[in-house]
Regions:
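Conserved beta-strand
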Residues: 15-18, 26-36, 65
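Hydrophobic anchor residue at the start of the ABC signature
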Residues: 170
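A short, proline-enriched helix->beta-strand linker immediately N-terminal to the Walker B motif
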Residues: 175-179
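Catalytic Walker B motif of ABC-type/P-loop ATPase nucleotide-binding domains
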Residues: 181-185
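H-loop/switch region of ABC-family ATPase nucleotide-binding domains
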Residues: 217-218
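A short, surface-exposed alpha-helical micro-motif characterized by mixed small hydrophobic
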Residues: 223-225
Length: 248
């Protein structure tokens, strides 16, 4: 895969002395700089802190330290402020955090963007209502692009396979049109064909939209497939950064 050198790019996300209180994860003192436009992988053994980093930055678990995005400090412990700053997160917990299982694919894809950015809404005077046509269009665009196997955009998320549910989580994040995307264990529990598609979708999103991506995965081989650099986390701290081509 084509590994790009972003060493001259500016730092878009700067993490200093991050600690996170997340069950089963140690995050004690993480320093990390992410370059604009790159795909940075975060790898390491289970429980060593890699999952704690995005969950802490995005405010899902109590965290401390300092995080700056695009030169401005980001308030920790506030998911909404992160979303307002154009950061998005595809969680490893797709059934707990990721999906509204009893809602349609349309509602899953469009709801966060409606809630956070007032997208897909029509207004007249004091009245606001959903722009059903825009919601239908955006959902079908991602069903098509991500090859989500479903009976249609009105199908409930619960009825999809794990791989297709994961693609809906990606579509939901893509619909926010973020500048920065954390994606955690994106291929966990899905079949090989769906894995390749998910990785390709992330790479395409990064290349075409210029979105900076940080991907957390236990699969080093997977990180090597799409990342430009790989940060290894051990014992709750950064243990070094490797170029993706010789991270063996």
């Amino acid at each position: 895969h084509d590994i790009r050198d972003h060493s001259d790019a500016r730092t878009i996300l700067s993490i200093r002395k991050l600690w996170v209180d997340m069950p089963g994860e140690i995050v004690r003192n993480v320093d990390l700089d992410v370059k604009e436009g790159e795909i940075l992988g975060i790898g390491g053994l289970a429980g060593q802190g890699k999952l704690g980093i995005p969950n802490g930055v995005m405010g899902l678990y109590e965290a401390g330290g300092t995080v700056e995005f695009d030169g401005k400090p980001i308030a920790l412990n506030s998911p909404r402020k992160c979303l307002d700053s154009q950061l998005a997160f595809v969680s490893e917990d797709r059934r707990g955090v990721g999906l509204l299982l009893d809602e349609s694919l349309e509602w899953n894809v469009a709801f966060p963007a409606m809630q956070v950015q007032n997208k897909f809404l029509k207004r007249m005077g004091f009245f606001t209502w959903r722009d059903e046509k825009a919601i239908h269009t955006v959902t079908n665009r991602y069903i098509d692009e991500l090859q989500i196997k479903c009976t249609g955009s009105g199908q409930k998320a619960r009825e999809l396979s794990g791989g297709n549910q994961q693609k809906v989580c990606l579509a939901k994040a893509f619909a926010l049109e973020p500048r920065f995307l954390f994606v955690s264990e994106p291929t966990r529990g899905i079949d090989v064909g769906a894995k390749a598609l998910v990785l390709e979708a992330l790479k395409k999103f990064n290349r075409e939209s210029g979105v900076t991506v940080v991907m957390i995965s236990s699969e080093l081989e997977e990180l090597r497939q799409i990342c430009d650099r790989i940060a290894i986390v051990s014992g709750g701290r950064g243990a070094g950064i490797l170029p993706a081509d010789h991270s063996s």
